Amino acid sequence: MSFFDFLKQPDVNQGVKEYQRASGAVLLDVRTPEEYRSGHIPESKNIPLQTIDRVGSVAKNKDTALYVYCQSGARSRQAAGMLKQMGYTNVNNIGGIAAYVGKVER
């Protein structure tokens, strides 16, 4: 990874497209339940960062493709690191819903 790759911000819109193409993938919203209720990307599962260890309830297989987002990208970056430490091998930090241009559910 180059220095410039590190600076590149995840693109939530591209990440959602990749999620939609991935068979058996899980879209994780790691914001608080209150934030999730205020509007979330359709089909996403709410597993707040503080309870990320409960991810096994939605992704039992460690090879499951996980697409992780939050509000701005900071918590999703942290959650992605934690998921990798837990042994998940296909973790994708897609950034923050603040940049999302698609439909949201409430």
Residue ranges and their predicted role:
Residues 2-18, 22-25, 33-65, 74-106:
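Rhodanese-like catalytic fold shared by cysteine-dependent sulfurtransferases
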Residues 29:
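N-terminal glycine-rich beta->alpha transition that marks the start or flank
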Residues 69:
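Short, surface-exposed ligand- or partner-binding patches at beta-edge/loop junctions that are enriched
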